[in-house]
Amino acid sequence: MKFTTKSRYALNALIELHLMEIDGPVKVSKIADMQSIEITYLEQLFRKLRIAGLIDSTRGRNGGYFFAKDPCKISVKDIMIAVCLLYTS
């Protein structure tokens, strides 16, 4: 498999999510700022990752994204399939 911009951004964003999730759900804007990614682009990637069941989200003032399953059990292949192959729109 070849890394695409989508897969590279998604992988880096999930690493950032893992590092920040200790304090609770993480806002996509915070990850976008840390990774210098357009927020709208990252929101599209996170939507695909959520549909694939890799992450989940909660609404509200303290809302944000968090892992839906153990991050140690998520493979690079899972991420690439979620953002590059499945759920294209």
What residues fall within each predicted segment?
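Beta-hairpin "wing" of winged helix-turn-helix
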Residues: 54-61, 66-67
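N-terminal helix-turn-helix DNA-binding core of bacterial DNA-binding proteins
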Residues: 5, 9-11, 15-37
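Conserved small/polar residues in nucleotide/adenosyl-binding loops
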Residues: 87-88
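Charged, amphipathic alpha-helical coiled-coil/dimerization segments
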Residues: 64-81
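Key DNA-contact positions within bacterial/archaeal DNA-binding proteins
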Residues: 40
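Residue cluster at the C-terminal edge of the helix-turn-helix DNA-binding motif
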Residues: 51-54, 82
